[in-house]
Amino acid sequence: MALTTLDPHTALIIVDLQKGIISLPVVHPIGDIIERARALADAFRARGLPIVLVNVTGRAPGRTEQPRQTGPCPEGWSDLIPELNQQPSDIVVTKRTWGAFASTDLEAQLKGLDITQVVIAGVATGTGVEATARQAYEHGFNVTLAIDAMTDMRLEAHAYSIANVFPRLGEAGTTRNIIDNINSKFAYCPFGNRCTEGVEGNDCIGKILFDYR
């Protein structure tokens, strides 16, 4: 289902755009994925909307048929890429599973900000992105998938998620669709998402401007 709207309280979740993962062979140019994720982050920051940056440092402990990497990750493998322009106000979630909500406090943090909708981008479409989308849906969030700001190591996994899974979890849109929707619905916030001087939460100027649009 194509993107129809964004709720007043929407957050962006960027999954696993970290140094070790972007070096893996993916089916779309990783530079394009990074550029679109950065564009989404810039648009959210300009409107004072929350951004969640997710990285992964290992795997869940359960047995699998597919061979698993053993031992610690190389130094710097889990570092978020600098292109995301991480800010002090960004929410950073470190996980050891596919989905960003499992065994983390992400749900509590988002609900503490009254978030009702999430936009999800990142790598890999069929694992980290899909698992995060499934968990967000199960926790009651409206879900939007930025389908041109994600990729996978396997084309069939990427295509299957987009065609068969995502339509059952939420709505899909391109980066341009999502940014256009943000620009049409949300007032520009002069503080970005770096509010200070006691203007956070319900007193945030961005929220006040939105309420009077």
Report each predicted region and the residues it spans.
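A short acidic, glycine/proline-enriched capping/turn motif at secondary-structure boundaries
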Residues: 58-60, 99-100
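Metal-dependent catalytic neighborhoods of phosphoester/phosphodiester hydrolases
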Residues: 63-69
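Active-site-adjacent betaalpha module
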Residues: 1-11, 39-42, 46-47, 69-213
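Acidic-leg catalytic submotif of subtilisin-like serine proteases
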Residues: 11-17, 21
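A short alpha/beta connector and helix-capping loop motif
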Residues: 26-56
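Short, glycine/acidic-enriched loop or turn micro-motifs at the edges of active sites
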Residues: 19, 58, 151
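Short beta-strand segments at enzyme active-site cores
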Residues: 15, 49-56, 62, 146
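A short acidic, helix-capping loop that chelates divalent metal ions and anchors anionic groups
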Residues: 21-24, 62-63
